[in-house]
């Protein structure tokens, strides 16, 4: 046991040899390193597997002993200043280490196939391994200085990976946006760290918590200054975990490769913000105003993320807003003091969201074979549909992840989200109503994604026949190969031209009317198999194919996690059998809402609460199915919907309200536009003024002095050059000037 803890310092450094060796190989042996590039995935997975085994062993020790182990090395600079470095092993470290390693291993396996075509394959795995190293260093840090160092490394890795395809201007802008937005939060975090060091004189977590609690108990600190420092610390988590108002970088971060999106949204960057709040909760918990502010930011983010997701066309951005909303649930739980529920939802959400992102990557990968390497097309849900029969394994895996995130039992997120919803009723009925309503909205937008992608028919072929794109088009990739897909101009389908195939996918009447297309597909299905009726030869249509076994393996393992990881937090204790592994791991736990609870729930209370939350989820699923599932189009054929709408008063007003909601959601709540007008434009003007001031004033003064000195020296040189003609000239010139000044 003692030896295991003493060896824990090596955890962050175990994956580090891979990026080092790749860098050295590319520097000294570039050709050989690139020739064996596919082999580098094996040491990456092997080393991360060692860390996973180490983390599981530490977790078992934590469950049995519930101990906290901290080891510190002191580096004394002088008598007044010393820097301390070390590592902290507790339940939170164990949970995060297992989460990072398990998701990281599966993403590495998945990426080997997903990125195999990419010329920058080695660079990708270098960044990925260093990302895991940085995150492991963050969760094992024993003081705020180490936290800040690894915090910045995590931000740097996310910047590199979001802008991995930096030759695309959109990706380059996205990584800059993420970097700058996180700098705002990181600056607040740094100020908060300095403030608490000034208050307590220590940055070690144990000493910091103890000294600060004593100062608060004895009322020896200025409460306003303490609150300000705590708020600055929380700003770091707000930016990193994409909480309102520093959430604007998250949807743009989807410009990176899909495996990176899975890792960022499941176990690394956004999880870092939740980890920091959980780690510093002993500081926040003694300041009621900060706890209330954390809960308020959480509930705002819950609603905002869910409402912005309901009208997005890009499948990855839709999932990004979903992540934002679910992170809001975790921040809400931490603000309420429900420490266990927050960490439980962090665990379950990580595996479910990783499954959804890898599933979306499988879909995108298969769509690229048809529409080319263009994110605007391959990630556009309007062009998808009918993938159930073409990618059945991906469909089933994605459905399981969707059901889990919707809160449907027995999948993982049901157990954790249900706990947060129940605790919200104890904290604030208003917050509880909002949280429960958003749970229904979550089910709506998640099934909207599922139905648009997998139900109906593949809409990309109808896009080709809509009369707008009847010429050849190219699928150009700035990071991959160039392919050409030809469509003959001779194809004319009047029936298809008359179809309403809008690209605008709203959640009500503005959506693409897939049911109208479906009624005609049966009569033209032969077109997709044979083009001889049009006098054209060798014209066929391609359909998405199932991903290869490497990608499917990672998804199937995540399916198992989604099924069974919820069992670690089940709070049933019957006849001496305690299944609540999570509560054992978190003893002693910080939980304000259940201080006297024994972590057991009676069956009646459980079924009552579960029935309510599941009913809300099914209601959201039903609404999504009504508007997006093709089978419900028969209702409109029978004019039942029209009869219902005719009975509604002021239908025009209702349509206007729907349009406003759609536009607000599709345009990201106009938050980006507001920041562009109010903040970014002013910053650009200030930057231009600073540039002018720096070049013309700061640089102009010394440059002007230098130029003046040069001309003055040249003039003096001619005056004293030893030439008689120069002396006579200047003598006469001075004489004339004197005469002019005297007589005129």
Swiss-Prot record:
Catalytic activity: a plastoquinone + NADH + (n+1) H(+)(in) = a plastoquinol + NAD(+) + n H(+)(out); a plastoquinone + NADPH + (n+1) H(+)(in) = a plastoquinol + NADP(+) + n H(+)(out)
Keywords for this protein: Chloroplast, Membrane, NAD, NADP, Plastid, Plastoquinone, Quinone, Thylakoid, Translocase, Transmembrane, Transmembrane helix, Transport
One Pfam family from the record: Proton_antipo_M
Source taxon at top rank: Eukaryota
Entry EC number(s): 7.1.1.-
GO BP: ATP synthesis coupled electron transport; electron transport coupled proton transport
Subcellular location(s) of the protein: Plastid, Chloroplast thylakoid membrane
Membrane spanning stretches: 9-29, 40-60, 89-109, 125-145, 147-167, 185-205, 219-239, 258-278, 280-300, 327-347, 354-374, 396-416, 425-445, 552-572, 612-632, 724-744
UniProt membrane topology term: Multi-pass membrane protein
Statement: the UniProt record of this protein carries the keyword Translocase: yes
Enzyme kind, highest EC tier: translocase
Cellular component annotations (GO), alphabetically ordered: chloroplast thylakoid membrane
UniProt GO MF annotations: NADH dehydrogenase (ubiquinone) activity; quinone binding
Family assignment from sequence similarity: Belongs to the complex I subunit 5 family.
Subunit structure: NDH is composed of at least 16 different subunits, 5 of which are encoded in the nucleus.
Role played: NDH shuttles electrons from NAD(P)H:plastoquinone, via FMN and iron-sulfur (Fe-S) centers, to quinones in the photosynthetic chain and possibly in a chloroplast respiratory chain. The immediate electron acceptor for the enzyme in this species is believed to be plastoquinone. Couples the redox reaction to proton translocation, and thus conserves the redox energy in a proton gradient.
Protein name (record): NAD(P)H-quinone oxidoreductase subunit 5, chloroplastic
């Amino acid at each position: 046991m003692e030896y295991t803890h003493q060896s824990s310092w090596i955890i962050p450094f175990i994956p580090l040899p891979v990026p080092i060796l790749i860098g050295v190989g590319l520097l000294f042996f570039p050709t050989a390193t690139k020739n064996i590039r596919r082999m580098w995935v094996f040491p990456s997975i092997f080393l991360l597997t060692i860390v996973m085994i180490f983390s599981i062993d530490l977790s078992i020790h934590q469950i049995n002993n519930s101990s906290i182990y901290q080891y510190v090395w002191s580096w004394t600079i002088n008598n007044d200043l010393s820097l301390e470095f070390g590592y902290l092993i507790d339940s939170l470290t164990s949970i995060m280490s297992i989460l990072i390693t398990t998701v990281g291993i599966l993403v590495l396996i998945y990426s080997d196939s997903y990125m195999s075509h990419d010329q920058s394959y080695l660079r990708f795995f270098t960044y990925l391994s260093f990302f895991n190293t940085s995150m492991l260093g963050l969760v094992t840090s024993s003081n705020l200085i180490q936290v800040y160092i690894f915090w910045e490394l995590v931000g740097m890795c996310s910047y590199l990976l979001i802008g991995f395809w930096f030759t695309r201007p959109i990706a380059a802008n996205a990584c800059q946006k993420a970097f700058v937005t996180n700098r705002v939060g990181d600056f607040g975090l740094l100020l908060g760290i300095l403030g608490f060091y000034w208050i307590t004189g220590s940055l070690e977590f144990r000493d910091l918590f103890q000294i600060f609690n004593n100062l608060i108990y004895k009322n020896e600190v200025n409460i306003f200054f303490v609150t300000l420092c705590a708020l600055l610390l929380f700003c770091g988590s707000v930016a990193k975990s994409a909480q309102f108002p520093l959430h604007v970088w998250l949807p743009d971060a989807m410009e990176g490769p899909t495996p990176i999106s899975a890792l960022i949204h499941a176990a690394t960057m956004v999880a870092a913000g939740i980890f920091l709040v959980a780690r510093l909760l002993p500081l926040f918990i003694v300041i009621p105003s900060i706890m209330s502010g954390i809960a308020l930011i959480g509930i705002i983010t819950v609603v905002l993320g869910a409402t912005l997701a309901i009208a997005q066309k890009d499948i990855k951005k839709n999932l990004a807003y979903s992540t934002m909303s679910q992170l809001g649930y975790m921040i809400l739980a931490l603000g309420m003091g429900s420490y266990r529920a927050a960490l439980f939802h962090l665990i379950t959400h990580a595996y479910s969201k990783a499954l959804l992102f890898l599933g979306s990557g499988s879909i995108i990968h298969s769509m690229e074979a048809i529409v080319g390497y263009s994110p605007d097309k391959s990630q556009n849900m309007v062009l998808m549909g009918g993938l159930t029969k073409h990618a059945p394994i991906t469909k089933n895996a994605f459905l399981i992840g969707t059901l889990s995130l919707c809160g449907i039992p027995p999948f993982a997120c049901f157990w954790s989200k249900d706990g947060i919803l129940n605790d919200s009723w104890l904290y604030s009925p208003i917050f509880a109503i909002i949280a429960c309503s958003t749970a229904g909205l979550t089910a709506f937008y998640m099934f909207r994604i599922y139905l648009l992608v997998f139900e109906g028919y593949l809409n990309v072929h109808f896009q080709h026949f809509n009369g707008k794109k009847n010429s050849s088009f190219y699928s150009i990739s700035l990071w991959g190969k160039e392919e050409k897909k030809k469509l003959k101009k001779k194809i004319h389908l009047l029936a298809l031209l008359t179809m309403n195939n809008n690209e605008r996918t709203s959640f009500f009447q503005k959506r693409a009317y897939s049911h109208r297309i479906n009624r005609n597909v049966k009569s033209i299905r032969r077109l997709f198999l044979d083009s001889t009726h049009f006098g054209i030869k060798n014209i066929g249509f391609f359909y998405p194919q199932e991903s290869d076994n490497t990608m499917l393996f990672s998804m199937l393992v995540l399916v198992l996690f989604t099924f069974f990881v919820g069992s670690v937090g089940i709070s049933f204790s019957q006849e001496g059998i305690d299944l609540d592994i999570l509560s054992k791991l978190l003893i002693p736990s910080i939980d304000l809402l259940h201080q006297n609870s024994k972590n057991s729930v009676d069956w009646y209370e459980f079924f009552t609460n579960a029935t309510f939350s599941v009913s809300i989820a099914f209601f959201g699923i039903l609404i999504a199915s009504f508007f997006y599932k093709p089978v419900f189009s028969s209702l409109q054929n029978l004019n039942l919907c029209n009869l219902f709408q005719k009975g509604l008063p002021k239908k025009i007003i209702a349509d206007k309200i729907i349009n406003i909601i759609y536009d607000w959601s599709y345009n990201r709540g106009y938050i980006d536009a507001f920041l562009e007008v109010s903040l970014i434009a002013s910053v650009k003007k200030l930057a231009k003024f600073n540039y002018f001031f720096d070049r013309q004033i700061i640089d102009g003064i010394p440059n002007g002095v230098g130029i003046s000195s040069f001309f003055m020296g040249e003039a003096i040189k001619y005056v004293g050059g030893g030439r008689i003609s120069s002396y006579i000239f200047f003598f006469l010139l001075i004489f004339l000037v004197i005469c002019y000044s005297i007589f005129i």
